[in-house]
Amino acid sequence: STALEIRPEIRLTLVQLLSDAAGAFGGMIAGQTLDLYAESVGTANGDEDIIARLEEMKTGRLLRYACEAGAVLGKAPLEQRQALVGYSRKIGQTFQISDDILDREGDQNLMGKTLHKDEAQNKFTIVSRFGVAKAKKLAQKLTDEAIETVNIFGKKAEILQELARFIIERNH
């Protein structure tokens, strides 16, 4: 068996995971649909749980697939696979919150895109609902939790912990 050969049952698992991640029932398609719906009705009635679910179904599902596929290919035991899924959920939400903060107060030259688009489009975000200060606190809490979640991997977790820190510290 070479490194390029992946058993059919593993391929099937990977395709199923990708289908779930992209899907209309809790995946990225559902997240985008909910996002567009929330834009049309406004953000005034949104709560933190709804916004977190929305964020999880977008960026979070993509990151979850990457982590979970790696765990499947690496034949990780269930406990490690679950840790990676938990980690991906937290960094996915952190990424989205950081992106929303940067949209509000980032440097347009560094970002390479027009700022304040979320506000102009009435986007349903933690920042629009609760403000930048609360969003920053939540992003830090999620980052700390993500770092803790992968401690199960010992020294091997360092790259994942660095990624979590990068997501919250990035300026573009």
Cite the ranges covered by each PLM segment:
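All-alpha prenyltransferase/terpene-synthase fold signal
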Residues: S1-H172
